[in-house]
Amino acid sequence: MGDSELDYTIEFPEPSLQGWPWDPEREPVVILLGWGGCKDHYLAKYSAIYHNQGCTVIKYTAAWKAVFITESLGLNSLREDAKKLLELLFDYEIEKSPIVFHVFSNGGFMLYRYIVELLHSHCPLNKLHVVGTIFDSAPGNRNVIGSVRALDTILRTSTNKAFRFLALAAFAILVIILRILLYPLTRFLHENHYDAMKKDPSRWPQLYLYSRADPIISYLDVESMIAARRRRCLPTETLDFGKSEHVSHFRRFPQRYSEICTSFLRDCVRKASISMLRSEHPVSF
């Protein structure tokens, strides 16, 4: 089912761990969505934050070619990955657990866009119990320079300079034409992820971790998304780390980062549990 051709990692909490405030039958599941070009071991330090809290952790990163090429062409290439990822929760029989997403950069954000659409439209995926989402260095809105920098980081380790230059130039031209110049027309066929998520109907809390020093994702794009949610009175928390670079907030501020993620996780699960109890046992007068 969900694990067919999906390159993911899942870690279950240690049975010996005691003292966590979770229902032992419904321990939280945290799903990490890596940035474009991310390796599984890069996510290990983030996974440890939640694993040490007694959570089940799933790590998945979409293929960089899908993130930078097919999605730029307006093809919904990540939608099937999103569906398979959510189906894993049923495969492992943890579909009743509270779920938190931790989304990195636009690579994770693109995949999350399809996840949200499926959660609101596809049965039985719409039965899953999402309680919160954390965004790290996301989202960005049609930032050509930032996208080129991100792709350059990926290609730098595996291609020569001449090929990399040609690939980056072709990518930049493609994005400028399809996602900027022709976007007033192409958006009717494939709305970009940023615009689509500005209308996200999800009411669970969201936490945005970003930095004004990020050279790839503009803090103005992040703050515009934050403002859009707050105008709709949706629960939104933020932290501007100020000096850290792209997806480097944990590396620069490990204690602060861990504390806010842990606090957000616990708060989301607690509020969701209270809400569920009230719905199951309504007070009558």
Swiss-Prot record:
State if Disulfide bond is listed as a keyword.
no
Chief localization class? Answer: nucleus
Q: Which GO terms describe its biological process?
A: negative regulation of BMP signaling pathway; negative regulation of ossification; negative regulation of osteoblast differentiation; regulation of nucleocytoplasmic transport
Source domain of life is: Eukaryota
**Which residue windows are transmembrane per the record?**
165-185
Pfam families the record matches: DUF829
Cystines in this chain: none
- Please give, as recorded in its UniProt entry, the membrane topology of this protein: Single-pass membrane protein
Q: Where in the cell is it found?
A: Nucleus outer membrane
| UniProt KW Methyltransferase keyword | no
The family database entries (InterPro entries) matched by this protein are listed as: AB_hydrolase_fold, DUF829_TMEM53
Q: Which UniProt keywords apply?
A: Developmental protein, Membrane, Nucleus, Transmembrane, Transmembrane helix
The record, for Gene3D superfamilies, names: alpha/beta hydrolase
A single GO CC term for this protein reads: nuclear membrane
Which family does the entry's similarity section mention? Belongs to the TMEM53 family.
Which purpose does this protein serve, as stated in its record?
Ensures normal bone formation, through the negative regulation of bone morphogenetic protein (BMP) signaling in osteoblast lineage cells by blocking cytoplasm-nucleus translocation of phosphorylated SMAD proteins.
Q: Which PANTHER family match?
A: TRANSMEMBRANE PROTEIN 53
Can you say what this protein is called?
Transmembrane protein 53-A
Q: Which organism is it from?
A: Xenopus laevis (African clawed frog)
